[in-house]
Design a protein with these regions (language model features):
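N-terminal glycine-rich phosphate-binding loop for ADP-containing cofactors
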Residues: 1-192
Length: 192
């Protein structure tokens, strides 16, 4: 099924082990020159590419939810990603009529850090007792495409929880303390 593909995009849960398994299985099927894109919102590409047999062809391609409404796609270069892989990925993203931006390889990249703060503060305000309508109206009035609570809902709490728990594991593996926010506490209560 994948043999003739020039570029594939893996879009499984934000879980390093699952992504590593999918990478190995997919790379066994695609050509040596095919681009392997990982749709991840938080996991650094250089780390994911360690599971690739050809890290020069490995790149991050982060779509935003809801995909059909969000024009932006983050392209994330890993430490070993080639310029040719970047060029092919830019062409692909433009062909599907999305707007590509190339961002640094760091946990959360650019937009997940910005939107995480935006939605997290919306949820924190909710936890403080501010009425949801006030939070949502303020979000809309700033010119954002979606209000913070609506965006949290559109992204899906279960997905956000998976991202958060993987990020927490990564912090712990690095010997760092994970910052517990009001958003984390509320998600934990709602999802667990």
């Amino acid at each position: 099924l994948l043999k003739g593909a020039d570029l594939i995009v893996e879009a499984v849960f934000e879980n390093r082990d699952i992504k590593a398994d999918v990478t190995a299985k997919a790379e066994a099927q695609i050509s040596e020159t095919a681009v392997f894109g990982s749709n991840t919102s938080t996991l650094p590409i250089t780390g994911l590419a360690q599971n690739s047999s050809r890290p020069a062809n490995f790149i991050g391609i982060h779509y935003f939810s809801p995909v059909e409404r969000m024009p932006l796609v983050e392209i994330i270069m890993g430490k070993e990603t080639s310029q040719e892989t970047l060029a092919k990925t830019m062409d692909y993203v433009q062909k599907i009529r999305k707007t590509p931006i190339v961002v640094n390889d760091s946990r959360g990249f650019y937009t997940s850090r910005v939107f995480g703060t935006y939605t997290g503060e919306g949820v924190a305000m909710l936890a403080e007792g501010i009425k949801p309508a006030l939070i949502e109206n303020a979000g809309k009035m700033t010119g954002m495409p979606m209000a913070p609570l609506a965006l949290s809902d559109a992204v899906a709490l279960d997905l956000a929880w998976k991202v958060t728990t993987q990020t927490k594991k990564d912090f712990e593996a690095e010997g760092k303390e994970f910052p517990v926010t009001p958003m984390y506490s509320i998600m934990e209560e709602m999802v667990e």
